[in-house]
Amino acid sequence: MKKHLNTLFVTTQGSYLSKEGECVLISIDRVEKTRIPLHMLNGIVCFGQVSCSPFLLGHCAQLGVAVTFLTEHGRFLCQMQGPVKGNILLRRAQYRMADNYDQTATLARLFVIGKIGNARVTLARALRDHPEKTDGEKLKNAQHVLAGCIRRLQEATDQELIRGIEGEAAKAYFSVFDECITADDPAFRFEGRSRRPPLDRVNCLLSFVYTLMTHDIRSALESCGLDPAAGFLHKDRPGRPSLALDMLEEFRSYIGDRLVLSLINRGQIHAKDFDISETGAVAMKDDARKTLITAYQQRKQEEIEHPFVGEKMAVGLLWHMQAMLLARYIRGDIDMYPPFVWR
């Protein structure tokens, strides 16, 4: 399976993207900064005051390269892409499944099992790697709660019950997340999840990396012919990529949380890399965004053996593989969708 894993993230304010030959040309104040072959990209993400020429947008549409626009701090604005790929029969099957209560509950349960399973492994890794810097009792207790949530999910058929168990697991996980942060800087203490806006540096990093992952997962779903807006765990809402958010749950901890923990614990992100507004909202400065994006791209190039398929692949291909497995399940080619659980 050959997929281009490169997403071009443009964060420098005032950048202008244009087409020159088969390359995307990035200029600032009419001065060329770099050029990148378009055939090497699977997406372009523009943050803040970044503009694109109509010719570039048209060519990207022809090549199937989605161009996404976000605010400077990562809030989704819009996405431009060419004709939707995929089999209409697959999408019809997806919509029928999303309208079926029992089938929706089944998939919602599997997404949550994947999420909690990976969260449990993240806590176990923190205890194993840093036993002298963590409260082992707290981490073990949280792992026990998560294991209990997974057992209860095995028999859960009610959608609201499934979401309730997910919330219980998230509360237990984030109640000890601060134990996974081994850096001594008090600026990176974590007291709980906050969003829209994030109210501390750790939440700011988490929200931003989740945004990057959502973009890539959305593209993977579309490349497999699925509609990223028709989800099972997350309810329909205009403009919300519910299915992309469903699949994101499997990868929040394994990719997003561990990446943020690594950057903090290794001292690659510093307290001075953030701005705090009068309202308490926290936002990354440009250097911090670039550091996180670079680390994210590097993480996507690392290899892992897929626990279900049994083949080695780049981390950045995991959501493509999960999207393919989900499409096969919806078509009836396999009996059950196997959520990704890191072992």
Curated annotation (Swiss-Prot):
* Xref: Gene3D superfamilies: CRISPR-associated endonuclease Cas1, C-terminal domain, CRISPR-associated endonuclease Cas1, N-terminal domain
What the entry lists under CDD domains is as follows: Cas1_I-C (cd09721)
Q: Which cofactor does it need?
A: Mg(2+); Mn(2+)
A GO biological-process term: maintenance of CRISPR repeat elements
| Membrane-spanning segments | none
GO molecular function terms attached to this record = DNA binding; DNA endonuclease activity; metal ion binding
Q: What EC number(s) are associated with this protein in UniProt?
A: 3.1.-.-
So which residues are the signal peptide here? none
UniProt keywords (A-Z) are:
Antiviral defense, DNA-binding, Endonuclease, Hydrolase, Magnesium, Manganese, Metal-binding, Nuclease
What are the binding positions for Mn(2+) in this chain? E166, H234, E249
Q: Which InterPro entries match?
A: Cas1, CRISPR-assoc_Cas1, CRISPR-assoc_Cas1_C, CRISPR-assoc_Cas1_DVULG, CRISPR-assoc_Cas1_N
Its biological purpose is as follows: CRISPR (clustered regularly interspaced short palindromic repeat), is an adaptive immune system that provides protection against mobile genetic elements (viruses, transposable elements and conjugative plasmids). CRISPR clusters contain spacers, sequences complementary to antecedent mobile elements, and target invading nucleic acids. CRISPR clusters are transcribed and processed into CRISPR RNA (crRNA). Acts as a dsDNA endonuclease. Involved in the integration of spacer DNA into the CRISPR cassette.
NCBIfam families this protein is in?
cas1 (TIGR00287), cas1_DVULG (TIGR03640)
Q: Which PANTHER family does the UniProt entry name for this protein?
A: CRISPR-ASSOCIATED ENDONUCLEASE CAS1 1
Subunit info here reads: Homodimer, forms a heterotetramer with a Cas2 homodimer.
Please give the family membership noted in the entry. Answer: Belongs to the CRISPR-associated endonuclease Cas1 family.
Q: Under what name is this protein listed?
A: CRISPR-associated endonuclease Cas1 1
- Provenance organism: Chlorobaculum tepidum (strain ATCC 49652 / DSM 12025 / NBRC 103806 / TLS) (Chlorobium tepidum)
What's the source species' lineage?
Bacteria, Pseudomonadati, Chlorobiota, Chlorobiia, Chlorobiales
Q: Which gene encodes it?
A: cas1-1
